[in-house]
Amino acid sequence: MGTTNNTIDGSDQVAQLARSLAAVGELIKKIRPDQWSAPTPCPDWTVRRLVEHLVGMNRVFTALLADEPPPRRNADHTDDDPVGAYRDSAATLQAAFERPGVLERTYRGPLGAATGAERLQIRLYDLLAHGWDLALATGQPVELPDDVAERSLEFVRRQLTEDARPGRFGPAQLVADDAPAIERLVAFLGRPVDG
């Protein structure tokens, strides 16, 4: 990983995570029963599978920060209560990032070594992008923290090389320079943004 933008202190970064987790949690709470099997902008993922991914990634990052093995990939992380599973995984992740020294420490992971602050930024951009996916798939307004999306966009622009895109991200899509930060973020990550 490269260096992080240190213009924001750790407590602000952790507060940004709390706001983002809460915003996505609100989207999940408003999913209607008939929407769980609906398609999403993520190929081959239903709304339920997308929420399983969000819960699973919260648990992966929590395990990584505790130097524990991550949960099984592609497992059903939600059981019969996706809303509760997300809420619990978000609270556990938030608590993990609030521990003293977590942001400064370097952690090993499947994509190499990175500081806790860098791990937090990785979690944020994935969380926000999938929050956008979820809002679109369920017809909800996209009400995600714009300042956090802007910071996430700055981070991925510095970190995501073109050779890292295949299999993970599509090519960057065109979007207006004055579009909301969340739209510029998801377009950079390969999602077409209409409008």
What are these regions (language model features)?
Residues 51-52, 131:
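Short, surface-exposed helix/turn micro-motifs that flank interaction/cofactor sites
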Residues 2-23, 30-43, 60-195:
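Structured surface interface patches that mediate subunit assembly and partner/cofactor docking
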